[in-house]
């Protein structure tokens, strides 16, 4: 699958595009990175979405130079709820819609920091569905009552996302009667869907930090995401 570049307001952005086999058109999905950036895991996630019938693109939000400045800017944008990173994600959506292989429906999926971006963008009326996995809620959650459909997954043992986040998200979406599937898994922490391929001896650090990959919960979350996208992006 090819690396690409696409136009955005500030400059061109690199990214990774995964295309399904067979004949399109297909719905699109913008895949939003976690704080680690364009990892092998992110490419694998993008490939999985393509294998499930989605024209999937992961923008490299750290792809501009100088890289350290770009990283700081992206992380700040995540917490501020505005900035060039959001413009890049909207530009990625526009790039997919302009692709003749796309049906015109586009969803979002994000993990950790990426899920935070998803939750902010979900209420802006430009995406058709959003999958936010263990993300921080926006500072102002009320716009989420006007969100696109949301599927979200959290770990009860998460040491980064505050306890009660899943319930707060459920409540604000319910107020707006937003289609939703919110689930908190009791036995996992942060990043339980991210399989970074960390060597075995180092995995104890993941477990202590409660950031370890857990296949049963990850696969359950994936099936919920794919089912939700089939319903709302078809």
Model-derived segments and spans:
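Serine-hydrolase catalytic machinery in alpha/beta-hydrolase-like enzymes
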Residues: 3-101, 196-211
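Short alpha-helix in the alpha/beta-hydrolase fold that links the catalytic acid
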Residues: 162-171, 197
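Short beta-strand/loop motif that positions the catalytic acidic residue
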Residues: 152-154, 158, 185
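Short beta-to-alpha linker loops that shape the active-site pocket of alpha/beta-hydrolase fold enzymes
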Residues: 61-64, 136, 188
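Acidic catalytic loop of the alpha/beta-hydrolase fold
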Residues: 157-162, 190-191
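Short, proline-enriched alpha-helix->beta-strand connector loops that line the catalytic pocket
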Residues: 145-150, 177-179
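Primarily recognizes the serine-hydrolase "nucleophile elbow" in alpha/beta-hydrolase
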Residues: 90-147
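C-terminal catalytic histidine-bearing segment of alpha/beta-hydrolase fold enzymes
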Residues: 179-234
């Amino acid at each position: 699958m090819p690396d690409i570049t696409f136009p955005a307001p500030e400059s061109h952005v690199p990214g990774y595009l995964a295309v399904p086999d067979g004949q399109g058109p297909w719905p699109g999905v913008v895949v939003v990175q976690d704080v680690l950036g364009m990892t092998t895991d992110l490419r694998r996630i993008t490939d999985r979405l393509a294998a499930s019938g989605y024209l999937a693109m992961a923008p490299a939000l750290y792809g501009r130079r100088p890289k350290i400045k770009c990283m700081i800017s992206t992380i700040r944008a995540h917490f501020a709820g505005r900035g060039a990173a959001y413009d890049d994600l909207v530009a990625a959506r526009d790039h997919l819609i302009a692709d003749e292989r796309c049906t015109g429906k586009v969803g979002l999926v994000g993990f950790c920091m990426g899920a935070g971006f998803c939750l902010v963008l979900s209420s802006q009326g430009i995406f058709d569905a959003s999958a936010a996995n263990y993300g921080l809620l926006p500072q102002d959650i009320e716009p989420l009552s006007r969100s696109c459909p949301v599927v979200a997954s959290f770990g009860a043992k998460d040491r980064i996302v505050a306890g009660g986040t899943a319930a707060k998200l459920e409540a604000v979406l319910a107020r707006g009667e937003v289609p939703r599937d919110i689930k908190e898994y009791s036995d996992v922490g942060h990043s339980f869907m991210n399989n970074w391929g960390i060597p075995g001896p180092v995995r104890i650090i993941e477990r202590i930090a409660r950031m370890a990959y857990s296949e049963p919960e990850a696969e359950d979350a994936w099936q919920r995401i794919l089912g939700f996208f089939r319903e709302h992006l078809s």
